[in-house]
Structure formats: C-alpha cells, structure tokens
Amino acid sequence: MKKQWKPVDSRLNELMHEYSVSIEDLVECTGLSKQRINDYVGGFKSNMNIGTAMTFADAIGCSIEELYVWNFKERRQLTK
C-alpha cells in the first residue's frame, strides 16, 4: 500500500497572522481581488486550485505544504 496525501483544510488565515500578511498585502502581491481572497480566508471558498495555492504560498513566504492541513489514506500500489 502507498500513501495518498489529501489536503484537509487550508491554513491560509493562520499563516497570514503568523507571517504578518494582510489581505491588502495579498491583493497587491497576487493580483487577486479582495473579495476572492476574503472568500478563501473566510472559508467560503475551500477548493483552491494548485496555481492559486502556489500564488498564496509565494506571497506569504511559506511552502505549499504549509498552506494546508494534510491527511493521507492508504491506496493500493499498481502492479504490472
């Protein structure tokens, strides 16, 4: 069995506080709208695509791994 990692929850709001990054900072650094960022920070929009996640991680100064709470499940290994 292999591990399959799944993002369980976003840590965006927590990391913004930890790294002292405001919503206005993210608007300026990412070019995303304030409303869209508020939706992610407030948890109203939970499914962030990989590009958006990388954009936030880069703007905050953290890794993409830090941006999420992760969980894994066992999955079967493909056999030949």
UniProtKB/Swiss-Prot annotation:
- Keywords tagged on the record: DNA-binding, Transcription, Transcription regulation
| Residue span(s) of domain HTH cro/C1-type | 12-67
Q: Any idea which residues the entry calls the DNA-binding region?
A: 23-42
Pfam annotation, one family:
HTH_26
Q: Which CDD domains did the record assign?
A: HTH_XRE
UniProt cross-references to InterPro entries, sorted A to Z? Cro/C1-type_HTH (IPR001387), Lambda_DNA-bd_dom_sf (IPR010982)
Please give the Gene Ontology molecular function terms for this protein. DNA binding
- The name under which this protein is listed is SPbeta prophage-derived uncharacterized HTH-type transcriptional regulator YotL
Task: Recall the taxonomic lineage recorded for the source organism.
Answer: Bacteria, Bacillati, Bacillota, Bacilli, Bacillales
